Amino acid sequence: MGSEMCIRDSNKADVVCYLPLDSRRRVKKFIQIVNPKLVLFVKYEFWPNLLNELKRKEIPTILVSGIFRKQQIFFKNYGDFTRKSLRAFHHFFVQDNNSKKLLETINFKNVSIAGDTRFDRVSMILKQDNSLDFINEFKDNKYIVIAGSTWREDEELLINYINEKATDEDKFIIVPHNIKQDSILELQNSINKKSVLFSAKSNKDLKEYQVFIIDTIGVLTKIYQAADVAYVGGGLKTGLHNILEPATFGIPIVIGNRYQKFKEATDLIDLKGCISVKNQQEFNEVLIKLKNKDSLRISSGKINKKYIQDNLGATQLIMNFIKDKI
């Protein structure tokens, strides 16, 4: 999905490409061809041979939105090789104080707490027109749950809830991670409510359907604006997807229980803007509770929106550093 986003936004770049496999020969050739003046790594992308080559060539290298945990190999007794690769970084911009302290334990002082640049990106969503006529037609001013970036394990919870607990007035939009035709048809055939696919929506009266399955990419961010509740997939097994996008719209969020590696998720769980579930029973209880308690939905949504607003500014801080130092 990251590469798809880069390609979609490729008008902002001269070239979009994959990094080579991290071998000395390949990265040496890659750097020779690209000849970068500055290199930015984001979050937790660490390629030892690439970093070592950047250091050898004395190319300014910065880590952006970095986040570190004590379980990482950098902080182990046997992590000398990986620690050595970190010396390529001229500066570390990290998300939190814990990351800064961990780097200091291995003698890196060139560290600033800047936060996560994704907050600045998602906040820009509100400045664009997010209205989609086909979504508005489908919603028809009814209560709607939007499930984004779902995997099979997420969809099992949704299917059971829709089939067994949903009233005729409830509406659902499901945006699967896997949009291969066989998977989409399997999902649709598992739902006993009236459903429609994005790819088959032409000439359909969308307000007559209860479930809308989006079998395309690139529209999820705008779709979230219509949600009363958002469920973000990946948190049960494969890795939690982006919860900042629904949060910026001020929507309560439900996720799976494997969220601990995602700072924004742990923060919003603690703040009570986000709720985690681990099984069908909890999923059912949470969705029913959110539907029945307007005050809970409103308060959770406000928490999420404020969280985005309180964490803006990382991009400008980093850009100022680049202008001043590089």
Task: Explain the meaning of each model-derived region.
Residues 10-18, 185-214:
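Nucleotide-activated donor-binding/catalytic signature segment of Leloir-type glycosyltransferases, i.e.
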Residues 27-33, 203-209, 218-228, 248:
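Short acidic alpha-helix that forms the nucleotide-activated donor recognition element
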Residues 128-201:
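Conserved catalytic-core segment of nucleotide-activated headgroup transferases in glycan assembly
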Residues 89, 105-106, 220-301, 305-306:
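Catalytic binding pocket for nucleotide-activated donors in carbohydrate/polymer assembly enzymes
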Residues 1-7:
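Short, small-residue-biased leader/transition segments that mark boundaries at the very start
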Residues 311-326:
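C-terminal alpha-helical cap of glycosyltransferases
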Residues 3, 92-95, 171-178, 254:
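Short internal beta-strands
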Residues 14, 18-25, 37-120:
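Active-site-proximal region of nucleotide-activated glycan assembly enzymes
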